[in-house]
């Protein structure tokens, strides 16, 4: 079964924001962990039509946010439903995201940033073809965290 991408509705945004809770250190990714991120995610104007619900069958399984950096470079944020993480779904999901971005936006590069403690995600991104670009520190969730910026060169 394939993944389907559709513009995120307000109802779907609220489900993700208030019902998707991750275990342990991954709770960092809970939308409610940072008020500014939560407000932006729930605000239709801020979200625009570049945040997508990702469904498989009739189930919402993930989301994908896309921000245009230049005509050919797009920065993404993505999240999988907590009960589906760590179960081998990542490669297929990430490849579907890349295919969607390339087909809709004609991208040359895709960038993303991930906390350096998220070794599971970093391993996945590298496996699919993302390369490390730089590390940086950012204030979020009430503290300062180190992030790794990664780049995928579209073929």
Residue ranges and their predicted role:
Residues 79, 92, 120:
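Short alpha-helical segment within the catalytic ATP-binding CA
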Residues 2-3:
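Extreme N-terminal starter segment of soluble prokaryotic enzymes
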Residues 7-85, 100, 104, 153:
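Acetyl-CoA-dependent GNAT
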Residues 58, 62, 90, 129:
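Conserved phosphate-binding and hydrolysis motifs of nucleotide-dependent enzymes
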Residues 84, 88-97:
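Conserved acetyl-CoA pyrophosphate-binding loop and the N-cap/start of the following alpha-helix
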Residues 107-111, 115-122, 127-131, 135-155:
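C-terminal "cap" of GNAT-fold acetyltransferases
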């Amino acid at each position: 079964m394939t993944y389907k991408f559709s513009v995120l509705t307000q109802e779907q945004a609220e489900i993700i924001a208030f019902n998707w809770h991750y275990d342990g250190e991954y709770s960092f990714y809970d939308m409610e962990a940072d008020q500014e991120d939560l407000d932006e995610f729930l605000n239709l104007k801020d979200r625009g039509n570049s945040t997508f619900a990702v469904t498989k069958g009739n189930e919402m399984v993930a989301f994908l946010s896309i921000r245009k950096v230049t005509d050919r470079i797009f920065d993404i944020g993505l999240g999988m439903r907590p009960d589906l993480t760590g179960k081998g779904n990542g490669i297929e999901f990430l490849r579907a995201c890349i295919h969607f971005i390339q087909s809709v936006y004609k991208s040359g590069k895709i960038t993303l940033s991930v906390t350096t403690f998220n070794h599971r995600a970093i391993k996945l991104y590298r496996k699919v073809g993302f390369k490390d670009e730089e590390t940086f520190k950012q204030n979020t969730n009430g503290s300062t965290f180190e992030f790794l910026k990664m780049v995928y060169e579209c073929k």
